[in-house]
């Protein structure tokens, strides 16, 4: 709440008009905002889409906020987990697994790939897994959750191991960290013909979409989905719109980080990606 109020104050201080409601593009340069009081049409030569993304649910067990959580629920938990299942071992999954393990929960991580933090170098994955297991965490790679049932007492999961064996285990809570879904529904992309790739808005190096005057930044665009990338895209788009000295972002130079113990950070190609690109490593 304090953070929200701080941002609201900054918007007011800088004389930025804020319209609360649901926005929908109706034409290039035109936006309709629907609120309880009615609809307001806004026009501008440049419009930036920054609607972000939301956590992807398991198709057979959507998050309920009580026993099955997304990262949003895990940030402000209604109760401290005693035995926690984390599905997915990307940055979000590992960060929460590490945090709750440090807080005393018994943590199990299930990852369908053959190693955790799969976007990192293989050596990093191996080192991190060894460290987390040493801290008491259970990590299952090459595994998947076949079913997930939640009730007032906890969560029951059927987990398929690497060798194909399915076992059932009970947990107090579950965090689902299997990716994100862009918030692009109902904002008028189809009407304007704005191009998307797997649901995410396609942009060039200056954050421009294929429709002149329409820009997009942050998690609603292509990966990596990182806060520092999103904020820098805001700078890029603003500079380009202002006509100053715009600069394109090279996605190969975006650092990634995972806030766990031990911490993980990387930039550039992994050894495997470098070899795939034909480099002599």
Language model features with spans:
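Glycine-rich dinucleotide-binding loop and its adjacent helix/turn
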Residues: 51-106, 110, 135-138, 190-192, ...
């Amino acid at each position: 709440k304090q953070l929200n109020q701080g941002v609201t104050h900054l918007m007011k201080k800088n004389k930025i008009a804020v319209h609360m409601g649901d926005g929908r593009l109706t034409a290039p340069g035109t936006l309709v905002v629907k609120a309880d009081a009615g609809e307001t049409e806004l026009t501008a030569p440049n419009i930036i889409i920054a609607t972000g993304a939301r956590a992807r649910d398991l198709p057979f067990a959507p998050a309920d906020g009580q026993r099955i959580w997304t990262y949003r629920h895990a940030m402000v938990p209604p109760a401290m987990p005693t035995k926690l299942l984390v599905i997915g071992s990307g940055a979000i999954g590992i960060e929460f697994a590490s945090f709750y393990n440090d807080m005393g929960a018994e943590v199990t991580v299930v990852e369908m790939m053959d190693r955790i933090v799969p976007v990192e170098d293989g050596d990093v994955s191996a080192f991190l897994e060894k460290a987390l297991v040493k801290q008491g965490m259970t990590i299952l790679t090459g595994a998947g959750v076949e079913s997930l049932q939640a009730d007032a007492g906890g969560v029951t999961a059927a987990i398929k191991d690497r060798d194909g064996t399915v076992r059932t285990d009970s947990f107090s809570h579950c965090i689902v960290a299997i990716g994100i879904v862009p918030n692009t529904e109902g904002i008028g992309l189809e009407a304007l013909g704005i191009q998307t790739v797997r649901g995410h808005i396609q942009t060039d190096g200056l954050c421009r979409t294929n429709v002149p005057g329409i820009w997009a930044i942050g998690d609603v665009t292509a990966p990596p989905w990182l806060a520092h990338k999103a904020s820098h895209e805001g700078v890029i788009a603003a500079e380009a719109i202002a006509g100053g000295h715009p600069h394109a972002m090279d996605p190969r130079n975006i650092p990634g980080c995972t806030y766990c113990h031990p911490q993980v950070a990387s930039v550039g190609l992994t050894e495997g990606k470098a070899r795939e690109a034909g480099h002599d490593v």
